[in-house]
């Protein structure tokens, strides 16, 4: 099934006379935990409760590992890591914890996941 794309018009915020057209994905909804649990249950020997328990534990443990400074590699899926940046200072002495910004979670998809999307097809809708 092709991914549906729509054409949108965007103005340059610095020069409203400059207009370009872009393709963006038409959203078709979202998949929640219950759907994922049901689909995994249907393709495995696990019960829905077992699947949900595993996924819930993963969601709970992921931040624990990341707070320990670990990267989390879910083979075949991808790698999660924390990115921390800070405001710049003129000297190292001025640099304190106060300049640290809130951490962000970065996700890098695995080669397997990227390859799973190579055969994607598109359709432009009007």
Say what each PLM segment does.
Residues 1-126:
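Strongly charged
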């Amino acid at each position: 099934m092709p991914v549906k794309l729509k054409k949108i018009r965007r103005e340059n915020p610095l020069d409203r006379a400059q207009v370009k057209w872009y393709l963006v994905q038409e959203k078709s909804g979202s998949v929640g935990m219950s759907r994922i649990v049901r689909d995994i249950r249907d393709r495995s020997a696990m019960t829905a409760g077992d699947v949900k328990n595993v996924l819930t534990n993963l969601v709970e443990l992921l931040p624990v590992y990341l707070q320990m400074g670990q990267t989390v590699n879910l083979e075949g899926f991808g790698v999660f890591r924390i990115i921390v940046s800070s405001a710049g200072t003129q000297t190292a002495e001025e640099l304190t914890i106060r300049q640290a910004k809130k951490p962000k979670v970065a996700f890098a998809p695995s080669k397997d996941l990227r390859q799973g999307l190579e055969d994607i097809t598109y359709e432009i809708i009007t």
